């Protein structure tokens, strides 16, 4: 009987740890949920354009990650930092500038507006800066290869 109680409590602990939070409910396996969007870091080195294409090919409605406010910036930085524990690389996000001289020409690849800017210097493609724990943005050459973060909206 004591052995049965131990096993049943063990199963209860396993069940609670797997279902307790429901934190990533609605996201595909391996994706993380934050504020109605799913995110996944890919440790695959691609140019900005190829990373965006890769994200779009994952499923409908996916793009490189958009970061419209500080809370989301912190979430994405933590997601990347957990994946890159020993190595440091810049990481692509979905911000691109069409005209390097005009700030208002920036856009997120998912079409959302740019209301939160954290750019160190200006160029066409933007990534997360490895030297700040991925908490600030850095202008990068679009043809360079870096890992990246994809984002998708939750299905309705």
Swiss-Prot record:
GO terms for molecular function: toxin activity. SMART domains: CLECT. Negative results: does not block the glycoprotein VI (GP6) and does not inhibit platelet activation induced by ADP-, and thrombin. Disulfide bonds join 27-38, 55-150, 125-142. This is Snaclec rhinocetin subunit alpha. It comes from the Eukaryota. It is found in: Secreted. Belongs to the snaclec family. PROSITE patterns: C_TYPE_LECTIN_2. The lineage of its organism: Eukaryota, Metazoa, Chordata, Craniata, Vertebrata. GO terms for cellular component: extracellular region. Heterodimer; disulfide-linked. Keywords: Disulfide bond, Hemostasis impairing toxin, Platelet aggregation inhibiting toxin, Secreted, Signal, Toxin. InterPro entries: C-type_lectin-like, C-type_lectin-like/link_sf, CTDL_fold, Snaclec. PANTHER family: PROTEIN CBG13490.
């Amino acid at each position: 009987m004591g052995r049965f109680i131990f096993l049943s409590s063990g199963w209860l602990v396993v069940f609670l740890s797997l279902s307790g939070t429901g934190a990533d409910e609605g996201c595909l396996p391996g994706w993380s949920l934050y504020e109605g969007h799913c995110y996944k870091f890919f440790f695959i080195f691609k140019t900005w354009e190829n990373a965006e294409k890769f994200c779009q090919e994952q499923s409908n409605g996916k793009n490189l990650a958009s970061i419209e406010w500080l809370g989301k910036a912190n979430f994405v930085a933590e997601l990347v930092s957990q994946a890159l524990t020993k190595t440091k690389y810049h990481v692509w996000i979905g911000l691109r500038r069409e005209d390097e001289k005009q700030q208002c020409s920036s856009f997120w690849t998912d079409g959302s507006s740019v209301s939160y800017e954290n750019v160190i210097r200006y160029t066409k493609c933007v990534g997360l800066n490895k030297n700040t724990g991925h908490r600030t943005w850095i202008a990068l050459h679009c043809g360079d290869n870096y890992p990246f973060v994809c984002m998708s909206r939750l299905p309705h």
